[in-house]
Structures are given as C-alpha cells and as structure tokens.
Regions:
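C-terminal substrate-binding/catalytic lobe of Rossmann-fold NAD(P)-dependent oxidoreductases
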Residues: 2-9, 14-74, 156-281
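Glycine-rich phosphate-binding loop signature in dinucleotide/nucleotide-binding domains
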Residues: 75-79
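Glycine/charged-rich beta-loop-alpha catalytic/anionic-binding loops adjacent to active sites
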Residues: 80, 124-133, 233-240
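N-terminal Rossmann-like NAD(P) cofactor-binding module of classical short-chain dehydrogenase/reductase
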Residues: 83-84
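Short glycine-/small-residue-rich Rossmann-like dinucleotide-binding loops
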Residues: 87-88, 219
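Rossmann-fold NAD(P)-binding glycine/threonine-rich loop
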Residues: 90-102, 109-130, 141, 149
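Rossmann-like NAD(P)H-binding beta-loop-alpha module
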Residues: 142-154, 173
Length: 281
C-alpha cells in the first residue's frame, strides 16, 4: 500500500515536535521531513530539511537550508503527500501559497488570522484541499456543539464569558479556540462577534453591556491549553471546561485531518468537516 508522505512546517516548535513523534504510530504514513521558519520582513531563515536516506533527499539537501517550496520541489516524486503547518499566520499564508503552487493539500493549525487572511486561504482552497482550524482536538470541536446548545436552551438572560489559558510563550491572544467558542455563542444568538466581543475589562466603565461576550486570556507556565465557558444567570452559573493534558491529542487530530484531506478534492474545510460533526443550525 502506498504511504502518504507528511511534511511538517514548524517542526522545531511544540506542536511540530509532537506531530513528528506521534507520526511513528502510523504505519500508513511516512514522515518526509520538517521545515522550521522564522519569517522576517525581508529574510527567511529555515532549518535544514530532515531527510530520509531511502528517499535519497540527502544527496541533494545535505548542508542546505530549504524553504517549503524547495522541499516540495525535492519531493515531487512522492505523489501522495500532505503538508501539516503549525507556524504563524504570516508563515502559514506563504506555505498555503507554496502548497497551492505544487498542488499539495495542506492542514493549517496556526491562529490569529484576520478576515482578509482567511479569505486568502479560502481562495487557495479553490485550487487545493485545505483544512484550517484553530483547534484539532475532538473534544473542543464537540464542545463547540455543546456551547451552542447551552446558549440556545439557556437563552439571552444568561451572560456568557470565556476564559482561556495557555503557556507563557504563546504569541497570540485570545486563542483561536476561544474565538471559535465565542463564535458558537454569537451564531446561536444571531449577533456579530466583532461588535459584541469584549477582550478583558479595565477601569471604571467595565459594567457589562447587553449581549456582550467577554473573552479573557491567561499566559503562564507551560499550560497546554484550558478553555472555560461560563453561562451566568441571576440564580445559577454553568461552567463548561476543556483541559488538554497532552499535545498528542492535537497532533493526532492534525494527522487525522491530513489523512482525510489526502482523499479530498479541492476545497476549504475545517475540523468539523473532518470529524463529521453537524454544522450549526
């Protein structure tokens, strides 16, 4: 059986390292190599491509520094492959463009994209299959459904606040997952998140306004990820919490997305498509 090749972008980061480690559990997948980039305004610095002797990439890439574009060119003989990208929004946009150039599917787990960024990635989805999700875990994606239903049945008289916690080196805030959870509530309540989201409160004008959704971020230690959604009424409080105890969960989700994507035609998908979860009403 032909194995599906996997290239990991952000291979030296927390998620990249975890994905590479977990890939060894999958006999039908082949880790081709890892690219790790630090994109500056006018310069790209990339770590050496991790090569495998059986692919004879080492004859070409030994001692070199490769971009994803160069890595895709070197592995052109491997027809069935997928890129998994956990870098930054700026690097991911470049990688999506390069994947589209070589007609290779890409899974993107980076966060912090603007609406224009998302539109750019969605346009690449007209050329290649793309999965983009702020969280690859089954639990979080199921939680989004639970939060939607909780908002539906509790009603607008229950105020909603979201608290997210991550390790001290996470660069963006709030997390992509917190935004996804807030969007679940906003969609159910038929409001625009951009108009009703409040990111932290400070000063003497912090009184809650109608339909607000508060989102708060904690950055400390090596917290893998914790999200708490609070629905507070006048006489009771409901708290729904998800705690990640291992990055393996996210890695396996990303790998599942890559396998699923390898059999898809062009299109712009999210993790809910991969998991077969119902879309919101």
């Amino acid at each position: 059986m032909e194995k599906t090749g996997i290239i990991v972008c952000g291979s030296q980061g927390r998620m990249g390292n975890t994905i590479i480690s977990v890939l060894s559990d999958y006999s039908d997948l082949l880790f081709i190599g890892g690219v790790d980039s630090n994109y500056a305004a006018d310069k790209t610095t990339v770590s050496p491509f991790k090569d495998l002797a059986e692919l004879e990439i080492n004859k070409v890439s030994a001692g070199k520094f490769l971009t994803l574009k160069e890595a895709l060119h070197l592995t052109a003989a491997i027809k069935k492959k997928v890129v998994i990208d956990f870098t930054s929004k700026s690097a991911s946009l470049i990688h999506a463009e390069e994947a589209a150039l070589y007609n290779v599917p890409i899974v993107i787990g980076s966060t912090g994209f603007s609406e224009n960024d998302l539109k750019t990635v969605e346009d690449y989805g007209k050329r290649i299959p793309i999965v983009l999700s702020g969280n690859m875990s089954l639990g979080i994606n199921v939680l989004m459904n639970i939060v939607y239903d909780a908002s539906k049945y509790l009603g607008i008289n229950y105020d909603c606040e979201i608290i997210e916690m991550h390790h001290k080196k996470k660069k963006d805030a709030p997390s992509g997952t917190a935004k996804m959870l807030a969007e679940s509530v906003a969609k159910q309540r038929h409001i625009e998140l951009a108009e009703k989201a409040v990111y932290g409160r400070c000063g003497d004008a912090a009184e809650r306004k109608k339909d607000e959704i508060g989102i708060f971020s904690v950055r400390a230690g090596d917290i893998i990820g914790e999200h708490k959604v609070i629905f507070a009424g006048n006489e009771e409080i409901i708290e729904i919490t998800h705690k990640a105890v291992s990055r393996n969960n996210f890695a396996r989700g990303a790998i599942k997305a890559a396998v699923w994507l390898s059999e898809k035609n062009k299109g712009f998908y999210d993790m809910r498509d991969v998991l077969g979860l119902n879309k919101y009403e």
